[in-house]
């Protein structure tokens, strides 16, 4: 039973979150994405092939991993692990359920501009990182924030960001992810959540205590595996429902601009709903501009910042245009198109018996059977949430050390493991809302620094060859 304190605080935090997500963040992050798309002359298109070759062409796949760094591929895998969390299934389902199939179109639009933003984050993280004498690499938004703003103001912004991300991702964020793991494992397989919690913290402790190198070694294996499993299952569904694929794409584009007025408020409200849901999910799923993934990209051992910037672009592409899109196509082709139970629901289906937690299960269940579909989604959610915990823990640790020094690392790890276990055994809506609020607040100093350092990013995007003298590691 919620205490009076929780009852009082919950609506306040919820109101702040709604204001931030509906107004401040959409405008700020979309604005930064459009700004960098223009200033870099559409770097996400110009340099897409270059980034693709770096990731899949064996150029940096087996790159140097000396000191405290990673290969470029490991850094990308760690970044994708953070991006592809439970939101890639539950969040997308919620956006479609609320905003209709048209929300997917706006996810694509936002993600296109987000690719330019994440290029800026990765290049700045590389440019401002610090390599210590023992090979340890320190990098992330706190370092380019203090580069953008000198003196007390810069330290304040960096400190604000560090506190927000440590709490939002390192503690409460990991708690939210472990909660999803515990709930899905108990529902799908009947495993008690406390057992899941114990197993989870044992595995996490082994990886955390192994440092950056062990984490990188795990993510470079887990991320391709989890993506392959989800893509394989999704493709099976799409093959079975192949005759509805043209209708699915038609619904995405048609309802992005002409949604049916299913929800109260009429035509205009339905369009705003599709745009807002698609925009928010697009922003929060790819994490471009939020300041999380630059921590991973800063650790990559590459010749120049531009290289890792192009690799970061591919991360958003894989997250949004491959995994997220596949999930959206599965949901729409099975539930909205043809003879689906939500057929004709162009805007939203809030009055139905579906919710964001069971929509994906029902979608996969139409082909696999509900029980098998639930188990498949549960397995995928486990991998997605587990990989996110690993990356978010690293990002939080980097900022904890920035705030309190190296001696705080072990204390942080112990606290993180406690929060991970608690997350599997309890559900607290206030924790979810506080995590979302801090997650959104950390965007503000990061976005301000990104705009202030535009000239640095433009320099790298236009003249990478002349800036390739730095060798890391």
Regions picked out by a protein language model, each given a short descriptive name:
Residues 1-86, 96-103, 114, 421, ...:
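N-terminal alpha-helical transmembrane segments of multi-pass membrane transport
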Residues 6-8, 39-44, 88-92, 101, ...:
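Transmembrane helix-loop junctions in multi-pass membrane proteins
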Residues 28-35, 39-52, 161, 178-185, ...:
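Membrane-interface loop-to-helix entry segments
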Residues 32-37, 110-135, 142, 146-179, ...:
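Helix-loop-helix module between adjacent transmembrane segments
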Residues 42-70, 94, 100-103, 116-152, ...:
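Flexible loop linkers connecting adjacent transmembrane helices
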Residues 61-97, 124-127, 133-142, 146-148, ...:
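Alpha-helical membrane segments and immediately flanking helix-loop junctions
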Residues 113-121, 198-212, 223-243, 281, ...:
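Selective recognition of specific alpha-helical transmembrane segments in multi-pass small-molecule
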Residues 119-129, 133, 235-251, 259-266, ...:
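Extracellular/periplasmic helix-exit of transmembrane alpha-helices
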């Amino acid at each position: 039973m919620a205490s009076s304190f929780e009852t009082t605080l919950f609506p306040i935090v919820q109101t702040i979150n709604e204001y931030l997500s509906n107004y401040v963040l959409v405008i700020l992050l979309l604005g930064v994405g459009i700004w960098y798309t223009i200033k870099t002359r559409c770097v996400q298109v110009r340099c897409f092939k270059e980034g693709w070759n770096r990731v899949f062409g064996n150029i940096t796949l087996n790159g140097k991993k000396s000191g405290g760094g990673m290969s470029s591929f490991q850094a990308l895998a760690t970044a994708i692990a953070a991006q592809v969390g439970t939101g890639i299934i539950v969040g997308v389902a919620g956006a479609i359920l609320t905003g209709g199939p048209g929300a997917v179109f706006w996810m694509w639009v936002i993600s296109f501009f987000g690719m330019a933003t994440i290029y800026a984050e990765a290049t700045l993280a590389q440019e401002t990182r610090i390599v210590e004498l023992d090979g340890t690499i320190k990098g992330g938004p706190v370092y380019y924030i203090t580069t953008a703003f000198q003196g007390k103001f810069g330290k304040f912004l960096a400190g604000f960001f560090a506190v927000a991300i440590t709490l939002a991702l390192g503690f409460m964020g990991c708690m939210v992810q472990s909660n999803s793991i515990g709930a899905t494992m108990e529902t799908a397989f009947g495993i008690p959540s406390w057992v899941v919690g114990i197993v989870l913290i044992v595995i996490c402790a082994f990886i955390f205590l192994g440092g950056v190198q062990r984490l990188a070694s795990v993510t470079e294996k887990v991320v391709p595996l989890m993506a392959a499993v989800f893509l394989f299952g999704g493709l099976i569904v799409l093959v079975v429902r192949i005759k509805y694929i043209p209708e699915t794409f038609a619904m995405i584009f048609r309802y992005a601009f002409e949604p049916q007025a299913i929800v109260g408020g009429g035509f205009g409200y339905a369009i705003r709903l599709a745009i807002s849901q698609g925009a928010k999910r697009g922003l929060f799923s790819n994490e471009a501009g939020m300041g999380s993934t630059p921590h991973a990209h800063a650790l990559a051992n590459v010749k120049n910042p531009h290289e890792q910037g192009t690799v970061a672009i591919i991360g958003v592409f894989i997250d949004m245009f491959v995994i997220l899109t596949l999930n959206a196509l599965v949901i729409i082709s099975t539930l909205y198109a043809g003879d689906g139970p939500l057929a004709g629901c162009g805007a939203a289906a809030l009055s139905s018996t579906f919710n964001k937690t069971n929509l994906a299960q029902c979608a996969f269940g139409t082909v696999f059977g509900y029980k098998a579909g639930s188990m498949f989604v549960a397995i995928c959610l486990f991998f997605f949430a587990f990989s996110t915990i690993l990356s978010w823990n690293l990002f939080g640790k980097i900022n904890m050390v920035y705030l309190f020094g190296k001696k705080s690392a072990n204390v942080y790890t112990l606290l993180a493991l406690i929060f991970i276990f608690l997350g599997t055994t309890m559900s607290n809506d206030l924790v979810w809302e506080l995590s979302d609020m801090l997650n959104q607040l950390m965007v503000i100093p990061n976005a301000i620094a990104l705009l202030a350092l535009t000239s640095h990013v433009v320099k790298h995007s236009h003249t990478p060859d002349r800036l390739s003298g730095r060798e890391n590691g």
